[in-house]
Amino acid sequence: MKPLKLKKLILEVHETSIFIILIFKTTDKNTIITHVRHVRHELLYKIFANITRLKTVLNFTGIDPFSHKLSPGILDLIKIIIASFTLAPLRLYCIFNLLCLTWFVAKIGLLCTNNKKTNEKPFSGWRRVLQIFIRKVFRAVFFCMGFHSIKISGDKSSKEKAPILVCAPHATIVDAIAVFASGSVPVAKQGVAKMYFIGPVFSFIQSLFVTREAASSRQQTVDQIKSRACDLEAETSSSHKWPQVFIFPEGTCTNSRALIKFKSGAFQPGIPVQPVLIKRDLNTLDTLTWTWNQSYGELVCLWLTCCQFSNSIEIEFMKVYEPNLEEREDPRLFASNVRALMAARLGIPTVERSVSEFTNDGGSAWSINNQKTSSKVQEYPYVIDFVGNLTQT
């Protein structure tokens, strides 16, 4: 074993021992957090799952939602090596051809249209048929990636009951499965529109694009969400109505181990929303997650996913959430309560931080009361919300 690895292992054992001793010796949370350094929280949580005090402290210190580390075993590595020369190239070849097909169809659909006016009213006639065709082709794309069957639980509500679908946790580009499975229109960042293959497709299905850095763009997107949700500019005929708006309120990809602060855009109209959950088996080799702090990018993520013989994902449609008067007047409260309900259903905590705070801080550690701490300390304060603490009138 290399000296550096041995030193790191000794440090981990030492700090973990201090952490466990402090849990049983002191009642001061600040003292405990001060001594937390590189402690493997998840492992401790599993070992001492029945100890209430340890649960409380671990939930308080939390888990970094923006980091992901792939830890393949020997068998996983063997499968990846074999699939890299057999299964993955075949799958990627099929995916490439299907994406070319969707790009070609989208380009045909966008002929004789003004890019600035594509979102003024929903497409109808032959363009609507092409939109449906593209959704079917994308289902074939996901099949080629190994998603042979997608488990869908719950019932998707009608637009009259819930004009907006809010989905979490958002961990990977594969989450687009939920968009196409629901037949809705997504809200995406402006960068998606510039992607060569994907951009024209998302433009043709009339996605809403938002520039996060520009306040005017965000407000314009909110106005468009309100317009589409209420069909203010559409005809009364069902064939000329906008489909439901699909939003990932977290606004970025996380590792699915906690729900970060929801952006309020989806909740500003003050109308009912239907929460949608994406469930993945985090106990298996997680090749799907693509977040901020990991050692490989989206292309490697796609390659590793195609190396898996079969991938599983579950989409659950929860009951429609109707805001009360207080929530209609306060979008942040509305968003917080919906997030609490979704987190409770998923069995994961919520963290009172957003990706903008993480990136503005350069990805450094967060601490209680936003105070800077040593770079060695990884502290992510959580707030646990359960259904029992959620009141709705």
Predicted regions and their residues:
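Cytosol/nucleoplasm-facing, intrinsically disordered, low-complexity tails
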Residues: 1-5, 10, 36, 44, ...
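Beta-strand cores of modular interaction/reader domains in eukaryotic scaffold and signaling proteins
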Residues: 94, 151, 165-167, 178-180, ...
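Short amphipathic C-terminal alpha-helix that caps PH/PH-like domains
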Residues: 225, 334-345
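A cross-family acyltransferase "interaction/gating" segment
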Residues: 196-204, 240-244, 251-333, 349-376
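Intrinsically disordered, low-complexity basic segments at termini and long loops, enriched
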Residues: 1-41
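Catalytic core of membrane glycerolipid acyltransferases/transacylases, capturing the structured
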Residues: 103-149, 158-220
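N-terminal membrane-anchoring alpha-helices
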Residues: 2, 28, 40-146, 372-374, ...
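Eukaryotic intrinsically disordered and solvent-exposed regulatory patches
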Residues: 80, 91, 150-154, 159, ...
